From Swiss-Prot:
Homology family: Belongs to the universal ribosomal protein uL22 family.
Lineage, opening ranks: Archaea, Thermoproteota, Thermoprotei, Thermofilales, Thermofilaceae
Top-level taxonomic group: Archaea
Alphabetically ordered keywords of this record: Ribonucleoprotein, Ribosomal protein, RNA-binding, rRNA-binding
Subunit structure as annotated in this protein's UniProt entry: Part of the 50S ribosomal subunit.
Gene encoding the protein: rpl22
Pfam families associated with the record: Ribosomal_L22
Gene Ontology annotations for the cellular component aspect, listed alphabetically: cytosolic large ribosomal subunit
A Gene Ontology molecular function term of the record: structural constituent of ribosome
Protein purpose: This protein binds specifically to 23S rRNA. It makes multiple contacts with different domains of the 23S rRNA in the assembled 50S subunit and ribosome. The globular domain of the protein is located near the polypeptide exit tunnel on the outside of the subunit, while an extended beta-hairpin is found that lines the wall of the exit tunnel in the center of the 70S ribosome.
GO BP field: cytoplasmic translation
Protein name as annotated: Large ribosomal subunit protein uL22
Length: 151
């Protein structure tokens, strides 16, 4: 069994952690969405992700934005990563439950660390004409979030 670690170790008595491992969703859109919710409270992050899942708010793309159309609610290119938002909402629920278990005040938590890491690639094949086959890959993603209690 592999052991999972977090890429950052913060003070354990004032922080709550949660992670998703080997999730099939877009790595690039996950990075952009995590950039949007970092530094926010859990309730504010939940509201933002719910709006993204309902396609009422788009995620501004800062890094992975080649050939992407502009959106009216953000300055510049943006997308609506619904699958990413739904998975991150589950992760926020997990983070909140972990904080309650540790006895932290959930209203005073701020997301101080949010990171996505590339996981394993799953190779599949698409049959083509004349007996050929084309491989295509599914990139899995690891996500970790750490929230700290702020006075």
């Amino acid at each position: 069994m592999p052991t999972w670690r977090y890429s950052v170790e913060l003070e354990p008595e004032r922080t709550a952690k949660a992670s998703l491992r080997d999730v099939s969703m877009s790595y690039k859109l996950t990075v952009e969405t995590l950039r949007l919710i970092k530094g926010k409270s859990i309730e504010e992050a939940r509201r933002i992700l719910t709006e993204i899942a309902e396609m009422k708010r788009s995620v501004p793309l800062k890094r992975y934005n080649k050939k992407v159309g502009h959106r009216s609610d953000v300055p510049g290119p943006g997308r609506y990563p619904v699958k990413v938002a739904k998975n991150l909402l589950k992760l926020l629920d997990n983070l909140e439950n972990n904080a309650e278990f540790k006895g932290l005040n959930v209203e005073n938590l701020r997301i101080v660390h949010a990171a996505a890491h590339k996981g394993m690639k799953i190779r599949n094949y698409l049959p083509r004409a004349f007996g050929r086959a084309t491989p295509y890959y599914d990139q899995l993603v690891h996500v970790e979030i750490i929230a700290r209690e702020v006075e």
